[in-house]
A protein has these predicted regions:
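Extended, well-ordered protein cores
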Residues: 1-77, 86-196
Length: 196
């Protein structure tokens, strides 16, 4: 029989957040779901950060945020927040007051801090995190746009195909190709690219 469903997140404390209001299902349709542990994801990301730094290679995240509009921006935000952990901790109150959300990437963060009294300090701390962490793959080296600027800039099926064709390399900030550690936190893609 045809029916309808809604998606509600229920916290351990009992509070509920409606994620999707009622939507229809046709007779015979199946709905599936999964669970993501944010702490495990951040540990995985931290390991990738450390691996890229120790091997002196680029770090890159590959998602499908254009199609996976709920989960992948959250995953992207976890990557951004883990890489810039000290920045997000230090400026937590400022970011909260400006409605900065790591799920939207650095471009949105830069836009929201524009004109803020701490803008220069925040930008300096972001630059320090980039200088002290592993080198980050670039979307546009000429414009200084990193892999962490916008969640939809690196689409896994296109970006990984280009990386494989390029021998496992992406662009660094100097506009040259460099070996890369890829964060692919999606089992639909990760297993395939792990074997490649």
């Amino acid at each position: 029989n045809a029916t309808k469903y809604k998606i509600v997140f229920k916290e351990n404390a009992g509070a509920e957040t409606l994620l999707k209001d009622f939507a229809g299902l046709q007779a015979g349709e199946v709905i599936d779901s999964s669970v993501m542990n944010l702490n495990s994801l951040k540990s995985f990301v931290q390991e990738a950060i450390e691996e890229a730094k120790s091997k002196n290679v680029l770090l890159s995240a590959h998602l499908k945020a254009t199609m996976m509009k709920i989960s992948d921006p959250i995953v992207f935000g976890a990557i951004v927040e883990t890489f810039f952990k000290d920045v997000f901790t230090k400026y937590a109150e400022t970011f909260d007051s400006l409605d900065v959300n790591p799920n939207n990437g650095l471009a949105d963060l830069f836009d929201k801090i524009k004109g803020n009294a701490q803008e220069a300090e925040i930008k300096a701390d972001i630059e320090a995190a980039l200088a002290n962490g592993p080198r980050v793959a670039m979307v546009n080296s000429d414009k200084g746009i990193t892999n962490f600027h916008v969640p939809s800039d690196i689409i896994v099926d296109a970006s990984m195909a280009a990386l494989v064709r390029g021998g496992g390399k992406m662009w660094n900030k100097e506009g040259k190709e460099d070996d890369t550690v890829c964060i692919i936190p999606d089992r639909a893609y990760a297993g395939f690219y792990q074997s490649v």
